[in-house]
Amino acid sequence: MSVIKMTDLELAGKRVFIRADLNVPVKDGKVTSDARILASLPTIKLCLEAGAKVMVTSHLGRPTEGEYNEEFSLAPVVNYLNDALDCDVKLAKDYLDGLELNAGELVVLENVRFNKGEKKNEEALSKKYAALCDIFVMDAFGTAHRAQASTHGVGMNAPIACAGPLLAAELEALGKAMDNPARPLVAIVGGSKVSTKLTVLESLSKIADQLVVGGGIANTFIAAQGHNVGKSLYEADLVETAKKLMVECAIPVATDVACAKAFDENAEAEIKNVADVQDDDMIFDLGPDSTAVLADIIKNAKTILWNGPVGVFEFKNFEAGTAGISKAIADSEGFSVAGGGDTLAAIDKFGIKADVSYISTGGGAFLEFVEGKVLPAVAMLEERAKA
């Protein structure tokens, strides 16, 4: 994967347009979770320290396109940046016809979704963005799977288009895990439904040495082995697909599970052999034997790709499976990449952040990359690197 990297460019005096992911939760005009801003700060600081004229923008929420709506303004982000940086950060509302900036100055361009034509990647808007800059920096992996004016079109028209440090690190980590992985490669796919992760499972079954399934997905595989799954969430219409995947790839299926009679955080966990699951049982987690077997597989892996918890880890009585998998990943000496919202919540809950080699910032983009799909923003950067 060959792209121009921002860190290889001379930025002094240049007008630099950074497309970041500053789509943060806001309540009462205050940023309530700053993780995405913190992730973008090093890129912004590098540009400022290099003496660039810096513009940074993002989407925030889902406003009606083409209409200003204060509820979705980037103003709270600007307030946050003013506190975090040693410079005066301004918010520009009307910027499409040009901006005057000085070297070492930072301006936040208002929510790109206030501009008509953003989502449809319209050429006229893309060219207006491009006219603002000498260098376009794509640094929002979380939106790299969308071809929009601020993620794709601008890069096709800007004098130079490059990958920011965040995006470059993401592509490097995912490439290391998928393109030429140290083996054995173990992929862990959790979540509630096979249908939503089917293309991920099919893609990983072709490259993984072992594919670990968990959550509601695992129930469909248990059913595919002819076992009763009671009232558990599973997809009867995908049992044949599960059987096919088990032929194509080594998929260790649970031998024991944690059940309850109702979906309730106070429900007692009953550990059962899969052959003993009753019609009124609901499977909510892996049992201790299955967790131990999978933990051994993970500990011996050279590369680990993790997307999704293996049980209802939000409930104290059904967290043991995901806790065991998390510990195995933390203890493994292999290279590990984790991504997806629920996965990040599990990493936080079990305190293994420092032990995961790379944590992906992109939800949908992470999944599409793992599915083997071409991400439009990345394809654009590769094309521009050839020019």
From Swiss-Prot:
GO terms for biological process: gluconeogenesis; glycolytic process. Gene3D superfamilies: Phosphoglycerate kinase, N-terminal domain. Its EC number is 2.7.2.3. Pathway: Carbohydrate degradation; glycolysis; pyruvate from D-glyceraldehyde 3-phosphate: step 2/5. Keywords: ATP-binding, Cytoplasm, Glycolysis, Kinase, Nucleotide-binding, Transferase. The keyword ATP-binding applies. Belongs to the phosphoglycerate kinase family. This is Phosphoglycerate kinase. It comes from Aliivibrio salmonicida (strain LFI1238) (Vibrio salmonicida (strain LFI1238)). The lineage of its organism: Bacteria, Pseudomonadati, Pseudomonadota, Gammaproteobacteria, Vibrionales. The gene is pgk.
